[in-house]
Amino acid sequence: MGEKERRGQNPKTESNAVELVSCMRVFIPFFWKNFIHDRIFLGAGSLAFQTLLSIVPILAVILSILNVFVVFTPFKRSLEDFLVQNFMPGAGNVLNHYLTDFIGKTASVPILGGVFLFIIALFLISTVDHTLNEIWEVHAPRKALQGFTLYWTVLTLGPVLIGSSLAASSYVWYMVFTDGPLLELKTRLLSFFPFINSVAAFFLLYMLVPNRRVRFVHAFSGALLAALLFELSKRWFTFYITHIATFEHIYGALSVIPMLFFWVYLGWIVVLTGAEFVFCLGALKPVERIADVFSPLRGVPEILSVLAHIWNGQKSGNAMNMKKMLKVIEGLTPSGLRKVIDILLQNGLLHVTVNGDLAISRDLYTMTLYDLYAIIPSGFWGDENGLLISGGNSVHLKTISKGVTECLKNSMDLPLAPLLEDINQQPE
């Protein structure tokens, strides 16, 4: 029996823990880099502003669709109260009064006005669709008919599903959980209903909206994370409104406006954070061991291929951007291409034109292959270089490092331009 087993430690459990820590070391920086690159806070602000303009139209469309179905008439008031009272936690009755008043007035809106409200609601759903697909790096837009069908389905079937859910749950609550010990179970189930509802909504959002295949496990994991963050944000926001009340102190009677915007902004940050999490789960590939894939030129062929397409397009007058390169460069993922372009931009080899295209900034006839090799950061390979431990002040290692560097300089003392021309002459 091994020493660890005698001490009560399971080697397999310890190995899994080490592997989990290693995965987190890779995943967290990858997630944060994508979070910053996709400008989640800016996207949430844009969606929050558009949501403020679309709140009443969307609620009006939902309730109008439910009015079409007579079976949902008894539940209309319950649904209206549910939507209004749970829209912003801790806001009191002021916002609820205004929203209820606005929704009541929409019942007398003429047909043309109703069509306009429906179009506004469609625009919000379209913006959400575009923002999520930007996170998933989907550059091919949906076909017009496909997109309209999706948005129409969300606006028409969504309220019907909500109404059906309310009807079914009401039947269960009042026919089954009416008396006896089941009342306590009913109370417990009701306390979990908002969280379960949030998980289901986030799951459908992450599973269906991206115009790309999303794995069930990834979408469900992101939905759980988003639902947890949403519950935490509700509790924090309620505490902030009831105890700190900065908005009310500054704005007085108008405080409901910034409070509403701030809450909607928090909500969209949660939604987009969950979406980024789901994307990163699918985009991050497991890091292989160095011994299995070692190559002294790792990363150089990919960077040269990107440079070659940009250089060739620049010479031929057909400027390149990320969307075009994703179509012509095979085997390079959107995240990999973005990583290559970021390196070239940061080191001044490329610049972005006023049209959003990429252009060469350096003289490739004087820049050598070693100059390109030297700018590739260690993080470009993933986390495996982080496993290399410094040799300290060993004289032998310094000598070896100096010899290897000189050897690389001599072997790579080639201008980049002829190499790129050679790449462009290769058959596709």
Swiss-Prot record:
<dbReference type="InterPro" id="IPR023679">
    <property type="entry name" value="UPF0761_bac"/>
</dbReference>
<keyword id="KW-1003">Cell membrane</keyword>
<feature type="transmembrane region" description="Helical">
    <location>
        <begin position="216"/>
        <end position="233"/>
    </location>
</feature>
<feature type="transmembrane region" description="Helical">
    <location>
        <begin position="252"/>
        <end position="272"/>
    </location>
</feature>
<protein>
    <recommendedName>
        <fullName>UPF0761 membrane protein Ppha_1623</fullName>
    </recommendedName>
</protein>
<feature type="transmembrane region" description="Helical">
    <location>
        <begin position="108"/>
        <end position="128"/>
    </location>
</feature>
<dbReference type="InterPro" id="IPR017039">
    <property type="entry name" value="Virul_fac_BrkB"/>
</dbReference>
<keyword id="KW-0812">Transmembrane</keyword>
<keyword id="KW-0997">Cell inner membrane</keyword>
<feature type="transmembrane region" description="Helical">
    <location>
        <begin position="148"/>
        <end position="168"/>
    </location>
</feature>
<comment type="similarity">
    <text>Belongs to the UPF0761 family.</text>
</comment>
<dbReference type="GO" id="GO:0005886">
    <property type="term" value="C:plasma membrane"/>
</dbReference>
<keyword id="KW-1133">Transmembrane helix</keyword>
<feature type="transmembrane region" description="Helical">
    <location>
        <begin position="189"/>
        <end position="209"/>
    </location>
</feature>
<keyword id="KW-0472">Membrane</keyword>
<feature type="transmembrane region" description="Helical">
    <location>
        <begin position="52"/>
        <end position="72"/>
    </location>
</feature>
<dbReference type="Pfam" id="PF03631">
    <property type="entry name" value="Virul_fac_BrkB"/>
</dbReference>
